[in-house]
């Protein structure tokens, strides 16, 4: 297996222009495809997940052109539901941001489509979304294991009264919200259980509004969506930088700054993961906010005990930042780590122990006590981009770290290690 050994880093200092947000990129692509008119998306993320969405849209007959660097996409909208040409099978890799919204969107009309993906995708639950779509009339079959992809979709979704379980993934609610305006009937969506990752729903609602559709949101417990609507292109749309990707650089600044400044997000960002900066500040770092940047300056870091339900992806970065904090850090209410690209709770606990940390892994929490000195270890990445990027922070100690399968960062940030090196001074 390919590996990358990062030598100890003495100091980080500088600015990083963030790649486009994965969450925003794939939502914007799908809405542009469903909309009337031509949309020009700029600062689009070039990554595996976005390529899977683009390939699917192409197979569904959507016309688009990409710039040479794949960060600008001119897309001609369909002016309504996507139409599958005959029997179509779409391979979506391990891209949850493509699988879940497309599963809902392709239930409009009378298409017949199969959605499949990598082996890990077949372990990521989709049953709650399927149950909700069936309540709205959708005809869906599981082709292998009940409640998991691959799926055969035969259209039929018309709207109506729907319940969705919000406790596993906010992507299920996102998928329903984006599809419901195009259904013939009005849709009332009631959320069961605690809604995880609520800020990601705000991203969805913000983008829907940009494309001309507004809905009634009753305290995130009930959403009322008028049927028979159309999305309309906003013309040009700038994809803001990826706030989850910002977390690694901001954490590096907190640990070994200097000051690290990330541009492309700021105090006005729609992404909930900008709240990661507040967590670093609580730990002892100094944060400066601008409209289009966040900067982090080193501070003496102290352990925290926090509910991380609102920023589950960025919370992973706190788990490795905890290696540099005084005391025992506890991250709570993170059950949905278990249904991401890998079982992230298990993976994080396993790899933190390799570098010498004392770790308690609960069903929905992790407790981390750093060692007096970090150990050099080969870090398994579980084909999970965030595991690779989180554990790069170990190099901010006086100990090297070896990252196995470093190219797994292609899911969201193909040149991550080059960008980290650019702001780093070797020890």
Swiss-Prot record:
GO terms for molecular function: 3-phosphoshikimate 1-carboxyvinyltransferase activity. It is an enzyme of class 2 (transferase). Phosphoenolpyruvate binds at residues 22, 96, 124, 171, 344, 386, 411. Its EC number is 2.5.1.19. Coiled coil: none annotated. 3-phosphoshikimate binds at residues 22-23, 27, 169-171, 197, 313, 336, 340. Keywords: Amino-acid biosynthesis, Aromatic amino acid biosynthesis, Cytoplasm, Transferase. It catalyses: 3-phosphoshikimate + phosphoenolpyruvate = 5-O-(1-carboxyvinyl)-3-phosphoshikimate + phosphate. PANTHER family: AROM/DEHYDROQUINATE SYNTHASE (PTHR21090), PENTAFUNCTIONAL AROM POLYPEPTIDE (PTHR21090:SF5). Monomer. NCBIfam families: aroA. This is 3-phosphoshikimate 1-carboxyvinyltransferase. The gene is aroA.
């Amino acid at each position: 297996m390919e590996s990358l050994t990062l030598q100890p880093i003495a100091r980080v200092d500088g600015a990083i222009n963030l790649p486009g947000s994965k969450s925003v990129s794939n939502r914007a692509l799908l809405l542009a495809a469903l909309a009337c008119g031509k949309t020009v998306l700029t600062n689009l993320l070039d990554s595996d997940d976005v390529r899977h969405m683009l390939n699917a849209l192409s197979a569904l007959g959507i016309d688009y052109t990409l710039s040479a660097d794949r960060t600008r996409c001119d897309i001609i909208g369909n002016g309504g539901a996507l139409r599958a040409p005959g029997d179509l099978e779409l391979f979506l890799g391990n891209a949850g941001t493509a699988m879940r919204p497309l599963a809902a969107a392709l239930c409009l009309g009378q298409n017949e489509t199969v959605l499949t993906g990598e082996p890990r995708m077949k372990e990521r639950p989709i049953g709650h979304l399927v149950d909700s779509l069936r309540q709205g009339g959708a005809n869906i079959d599981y082709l292998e294991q009940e409640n998991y992809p691959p799926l055969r979709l035969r259209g039929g979704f018309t709207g109506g009264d729907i319940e969705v379980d919000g406790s596993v993934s906010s992507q299920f609610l996102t998928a329903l919200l984006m599809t419901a305006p195009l259904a013939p009937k009005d849709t009332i969506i009631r959320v069961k259980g605690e809604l995880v990752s609520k800020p990601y729903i705000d991203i969805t609602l913000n983008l829907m509004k940009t494309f001309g559709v507004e809905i009634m949101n009753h305290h995130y417990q009930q959403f009322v969506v008028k049927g028979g609507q159309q999305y309309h292109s906003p013309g040009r749309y700038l994809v803001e930088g990826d706030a989850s990707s910002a977390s690694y650089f901001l954490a590096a600044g907190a640990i070994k700054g200097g000051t690290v400044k990330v541009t492309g997000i700021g105090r006005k960002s729609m992404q909930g993961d900008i709240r990661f900066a507040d967590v670093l500040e609580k730990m002892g770092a100094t944060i400066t906010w601008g409209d289009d940047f966040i900067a982090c300056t080193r501070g003496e870091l102290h352990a925290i005990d926090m509910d991380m339900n609102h920023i589950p992806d960025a919370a992973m970065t706190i788990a490795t930042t905890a290696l540099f904090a005084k005391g025992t850090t506890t991250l709570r209410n993170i059950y949905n780590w278990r249904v991401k690209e890998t079982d992230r709770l298990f993976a994080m606990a396993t790899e933190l122990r390799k570098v010498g940390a004392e770790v308690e892994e609960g069903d929905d929490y992790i407790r981390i006590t750093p060692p007096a000195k970090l150990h050099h270890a080969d870090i398994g990445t579980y084909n999970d981009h965030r595991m690779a990027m989180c554990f790069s922070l170990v190099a901010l100690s006086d100990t090297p770290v070896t990252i196995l399968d470093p190219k797994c960062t292609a899911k969201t940030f193909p040149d991550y290690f080059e960008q980290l090196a650019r702001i780093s001074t070797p020890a």
